[in-house]
Amino acid sequence: MGALITYYCLRSLFENISPEYPLVAFYNQTNKKKIPILYWENSIGRDKHSDIVVDSPMASRNHAVFCRRNEGWIISDTNSKCGVLLNGEKISKSETVYIDDVVEIGGEEYKLSKSEILGKNNVRPLKAHAYSNSSILVLISIFGFLAALVLCFSSGSFNYNPMIIFGLLFSVSWISYFVTAFIFKRVNFEIELLGIFLSSIGILTLGGVDMGEAYTQIAALGIGIIFFNLILFMIREPDLAMRLRPYIAIMAVILLIINLVFGKVKNGSQNWIMIGHFSFQPSELVKVAFIFFGTSTLQGIQTTKNLTGFIIFSGICMGALILMGDFGTASVFFITFILISFMRSGNIRTVFLICAAAAIGFLFIMKFKPYIITRFSAWRHVWEHINDTGYQQTRVLTYAASGGLLGLGLGKGCLKYIFAAPSDLVFGMLCEEWGLILAVIILFSIAFLGIYSRKASVKSRSAFYSIAACCASGMIVFQMIMNVFGVVDILPLTGVTLPFVSQGGSSLISVWGLLAFIKASDERTYALRR
């Protein structure tokens, strides 16, 4: 059933990526050619990689940006040599372009016209969903009920607490669906379905270890879904999101400072803030801010050529994480930094320079903090350290193998008695209790978020959504790789959580925040309503 749910969710996601129909067209009045406008944001210039290439020596490599906003089509000069003329008048800022208006770029005149395809079909075909969202949610509910029922009898006698967990999960899931469908009136719910499915597996797995922690995780799921919708609201307009970026960065830096001053050391890292009996990790929320501040609209990319502000912000974030001793999360930030830098600059040399600087920085840290090397002493040699530094990985490998393809049954595993089993080692618990088949399905589900983001980003309403979706999914996928490869001794064990599934309220809230960026890249999120 888990495979069926994943298949329906992913197929519905991929089938709803709309084909590239032209929105409008530019008619070149010099050579009489019609240039289709395929995207919501289009670069114009002499550069061969521009969306609209102007073959004129008078044009700048990056001359202008032509984009669609609520008020219509907008053209903006991006500090070009000879400027942009609209109906014979030079523009000094962004101006609205209407049908039959003439734009002059580099001596070439382009007349905006309606797309012939749009004229014939009236509107681009865009399906609401390939499968009924409510039907998939019913399947997820049945899956959760059966898993909770197994957990009720896992101890040998009937325990009703797992049914309470299921009831709460059922309520959170269906309330989220009804709010999305009938209050926000969105037609797409597939991303949320996948998130709910993966989160439910994590919460039910945790229920077999500690019921109290499972209730806390459900509360985190509810907060995460609210956070998800808040992010969607904040980035509903790319220009609004751009104005919010500096404030988001300031809030993130304040969180990191609070963490450095008041943070408590837990499991070797000073990244926990304690409030009474509750604790949370500010660095998890900073992940969302990192994506938010790092991305940009096409106009912002073309007019601001350097990455100085983002580099400084990234240095503050990663420096703070290193001071806290959280090298796993610092690695996740670094990979995401490379992704954002490449997507914003498109320059491979920039990436190589960043990696070289990082390598030098790593050697510098090793020189002044040599104790860090001891954390990697068992890497690739865990069976030689079975009772000390390799204790956790050897137990994961042993108990995961005992689960076979179908698992021992929820709550019947032995790995749950090992320290950090439901958080850092949760992949081993999935293999032992749920079976290797479902564990691999979960990994493929997370990995396909990255593939989907890449495909959907081409049709996004703005480069802001494209960059944010690709980098958010990249962060999630890399975090998954570090967690899974760490517990099976392919990579060093860093304490990075498995997205959606691992115990940790801060982590769950954060990953739902990242999921909002992927959701925003779906053209239907803001364009279609019930």
Which ranges hold each PLM region?
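Hydrophobic alpha-helical transmembrane segments
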Residues: 168-172, 223-224, 432-451
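Intrinsically disordered, low-complexity acidic Ser/Thr-rich regulatory segments
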Residues: 1-56, 117-125
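A juxtamembrane structural motif centered on a specific transmembrane helix
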Residues: 483-530
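Hydrophobic alpha-helical segments of polytopic membrane proteins
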Residues: 304-323, 327-367
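Hydrophobic, glycine- and aromatic-enriched re-entrant/interface helices and adjoining loop segments
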Residues: 266, 270-272, 279, 352-441, ...
